[in-house]
């Protein structure tokens, strides 16, 4: 994506998430969506699913397919955990050049220490069962620990 298109899409993503009528320089709020023929406007709140990103004006199927594997809406934290973040996300972080990214990935692969960050409350749990004849069954769930005794876990997604 060229830098101008990237900045435009970034502004539109931020406008999608932020309440209020104020629009970023290259962003889009409800009037811009209507003018472009969309039957909806921005949420003006946090993304509820990664797939919702497809609704942002200017998001292409190809770009979404490239970005989606590195995104989550479940962490409920404003930061990235470098001990588990995909390489693409690490490269996008401020101050993470190729050398720093490669060093962190090597340390992770070797079981070395990585920066300690506070863990969020959302986790992906994946279970795989191998059966006879090469049968393979895999299921994943995204869950959140609530800290409440009456409902200790919320299931966000079950695949």
Where are these regions (language model features)?
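Compositionally biased linear targeting/interaction segments
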Residues: 1-159
